[in-house]
């Protein structure tokens, strides 16, 4: 079930228009996740970095924007992931940008916008269900930038299968919370909700 949910999410929340032609600038936004207690890079962070690295188009000028603050640890998530991408995956330092203030997925997108506005092609690197939520947030915050969204290479059959169940559970809970909020807002009389 989790495998199917991630596969489906990897194909959702993209513009209907044709993708940007070859060439032009590219930005891959890599969403944060807390580092391990010992300061090491979490397996979910490593997965997101691998997704980002394989999503970069070698025919384009581009950057990877690592986003995430120091949420549960002293070190910002973005710095740990950027270091892993540079030192382990071989991402050139000049292609790395770091945003260290974000404390949520909404803020990951919001605070990355100044670093991706120049791009003609934008991809979001995370587990597929989380990336779909982030694409929806970009569409809400900046529809003009969401029109430049392109798929990341985020879904591979059975890749990181041990992470797909908990990430799918987390995203399904987020969807349930969002839907519950809509129901509750619908139950509040208009005069009360406008105050």
Segments and roles (model prediction):
Residues 158-195:
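C-terminal capping/extension of enzyme domains
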Residues 7-169:
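A structural signal for short, hydrophobic/glycine-enriched beta-strand patches
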């Amino acid at each position: 079930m989790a495998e199917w949910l991630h596969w489906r999410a990897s194909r959702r929340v993209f513009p209907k228009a044709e993708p940007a032609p070859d060439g032009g600038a590219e930005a891959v936004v890599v969403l944060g996740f807390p580092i391990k207690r010992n300061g090491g890079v979490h397996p979910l962070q490593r997965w997101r970095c691998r997704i980002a690295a394989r999503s970069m188009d070698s025919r384009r000028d581009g950057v990877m924007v690592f986003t995430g603050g120091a949420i549960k640890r002293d070190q910002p998530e973005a710095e740990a992931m950027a270091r892993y991408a540079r030192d382990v995956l071989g991402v050139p330092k000049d292609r790395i940008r770091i945003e260290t203030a974000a404390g949520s997925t909404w803020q990951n997108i919001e605070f990355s916008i100044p670093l991706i506005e120049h791009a003609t092609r934008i991809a979001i690197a995370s587990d597929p269900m989380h990336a779909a939520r982030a694409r929806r947030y970009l569409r809400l915050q900046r529809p003009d930038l969401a029109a430049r969204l392109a798929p990341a290479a985020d879904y591979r059959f059975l890749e990181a299968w041990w992470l797909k169940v908990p990430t799918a559970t987390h995203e399904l809970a987020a969807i349930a919370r969002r839907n519950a909020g809509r129901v509750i807002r619908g139950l509040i009389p208009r005069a009360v909700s406008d105050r």
